[in-house]
């Protein structure tokens, strides 16, 4: 039996990747977020109860630092899972966000579990029925490896796919090239060129502090949104330069692709 009938012969990889873009947005990121909140909850409670030098270890700055990091990573993880789940609810297939989430959140899980093990000390090292962290810590490499190992996702998929899927003109240029549609290609090409020059001008003016990006809201977060807009303009310029200079060889230059993905 062939899924989709005879017309889908040879389309198995495409169907698998399309399903993966949805499933990978839900399973591993949600699992990593659950693990993060679980480890953070136990760590917060344990460090209040555990006392050293007659004070709770939660009051020691050396313990507060990893606890704060754990809280931040757990908050970021939960927020991103809500965002991508909302995208799926609206019928989208977030292939690139799913790759980002899978890679980043399982790496967050690695850091968070290491911090949890550190603040628990010997209690988390000895396996047994009262060790509520050891199994999760030992299972973390599974999440990092399955559904696209993080080393592959980071080096090939995030920017390798994102540079094409998320670009307003590259897909149109490739489609026009395949169909030999010169009119469509010229339209996409000159639009792409205009985007590059516009990005360059925006990146340099914002980089030198000339003008500020408009943001759709007011309040304390405005300055951070403007900083993100400035950095995004610089990133867009770097991405365009990498794509223009390396072309199809960009996927083979995995360290560059990985850094742009980061």
Predicted regions and their residues:
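Flavin-dependent oxidoreductase catalytic core characteristic
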Residues: 1-262
């Amino acid at each position: 039996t062939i899924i989709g009938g005879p017309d889908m012969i040879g389309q198995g990889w495409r169907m698998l990747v399309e399903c993966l873009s949805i499933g990978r947005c839900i399973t591993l990121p949600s699992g990593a977020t659950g693990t993060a909140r679980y480890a953070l909850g136990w760590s917060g409670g344990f460090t209040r109860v555990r006392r050293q030098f007659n004070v709770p270890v939660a009051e020691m700055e050396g313990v507060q630092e990893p606890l704060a990091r754990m809280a931040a990573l757990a908050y970021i993880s939960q927020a991103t899972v809500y965002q991508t789940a909302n995208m799926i609810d609206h019928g989208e297939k977030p292939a690139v966000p799913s790759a980002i989430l899978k890679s980043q959140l399982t790496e967050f899980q690695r850091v968070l579990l290491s911090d949890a093990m550190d603040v628990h000390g010997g209690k988390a090292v000895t396996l047994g029925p009262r060790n509520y962290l050891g199994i999760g810590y030992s299972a973390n490499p599974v999440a990092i490896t399955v559904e696209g190992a993080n080393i592959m996702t980071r080096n090939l998929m995030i920017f390798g796919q994102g540079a094409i899927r998320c670009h307003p003109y590259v897909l149109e240029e490739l489609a026009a090239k395949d169909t030999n549609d010169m009119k469509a290609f010229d339209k996409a090409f000159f639009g792409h060129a205009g985007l590059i020059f516009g990005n360059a001008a925006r990146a340099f003016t914002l980089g030198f502090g000339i003008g500020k990006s408009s943001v759709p809201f007011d309040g304390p977060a405005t300055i951070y949104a403007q900083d993100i807009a400035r950095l995004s303009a610089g990133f867009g310029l770097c991405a365009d330069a990498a794509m223009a200079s390396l072309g199809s060889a960009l996927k083979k230059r995995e360290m560059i692709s990985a850094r742009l993905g980061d």
